[in-house]
Amino acid sequence: MDSNTITSFQVDCYLWHIRKLLSMRDMCDAPFDDRLRRDQKALKGRGSTLGLDLRVATMEGKKIVEDILKSETDENLKIAIASSPAPRYITDMSIEEISREWYMLMPRQKITGGLMVKMDQAIMDKRIILKANFSVLFDQLETLVSLRAFTEDGAIVAEISPIPSMPGHSTEDVKNAIGILIGGLEWNDNSIRASENIQRFAWGIRDENGRPPLPPKQKRYMARRVESEV
C-alpha cells in the first residue's frame, strides 16, 4: 500500500476530528455540519477499503499535523492562504431535505465516475426538480455533496451521491450522472427541471425550461431506445 495514501487518510481523519469538535461546540454553520456528515461516511468507506482503524489513524494524523505545525511560520501560512482560492458552498437543499430517508418501489442504480445514481422507475408523469448541494471553485462546480430529485409535493424520487470508497469526481462526471438520471426519469414521461444553481455552475448556462442538455453519449442512448420503441 502506498505510504502517501496512508498518510493522507490519517491526516484527513485528524482534521475531521477537529471539525467535529467545532460542531460540538456550536461554532459552525449548517453547510459545515452538512459536509461533516458526508465526510464521516467517506472516511468510514476509505478506512474499510484500506483496512485501517479510524481511531488509530486519527492519532497518527495528529502526530503528523503537530510535526508540520512546529516547523510552520506565520509568513508561510499567509502566503499559502493568499495563493489558494477558497471554494464557495452552494445549497439548493435544506438540512432536512438532504438528510431525509427515502425509498424506491422499483429501484434502479448505476455507478459512473465515482458517483452513485439511484432512481425510482415507478415514478411516472410527474413534474420533477433537481436540487443539489456542492462546492464551487472558479465559478464552476468542484465537488458534489448530494443531488436529489423532488416531485412537486416534495417526495424524493432520485439521487446522485459520491461513493465514499472511490476517488473524487470531476464536473464532467457530475454532468454525465445528471444525464443518466434525466434520461431514466424522462423515459417514464416525467418532466425534469434543474435548479438555476445546477444550470449555472455545472453547464454555465440557463435554459428557460430549466432542463440541462444531455451529454452526447446519453443522447445517442436515448435515441436508440426511441427507435427500438418505434
Swiss-Prot record:
InterPro entries assigned: NS1, NS1A, NS1A_effect_dom-like_sf, uS15_NS1_RNA-bd_sf
- Keyword RNA-binding part of the UniProt annotation: yes
Annotated region (RNA-binding and homodimerization) at 1-73
Its primary localisation, in coarse terms, equals: host cell
Q: Where is this motif: Nuclear localization signal?
A: 34-38
The residues the entry assigns to the signal sequence are none
**Span(s) of short sequence motif Nuclear export signal:** 137-146
Q: Which region ranges are annotated with the description PABPN1-binding?
A: 223-230
Q: What is this protein called?
A: Non-structural protein 1
Protein encoded by which gene: NS
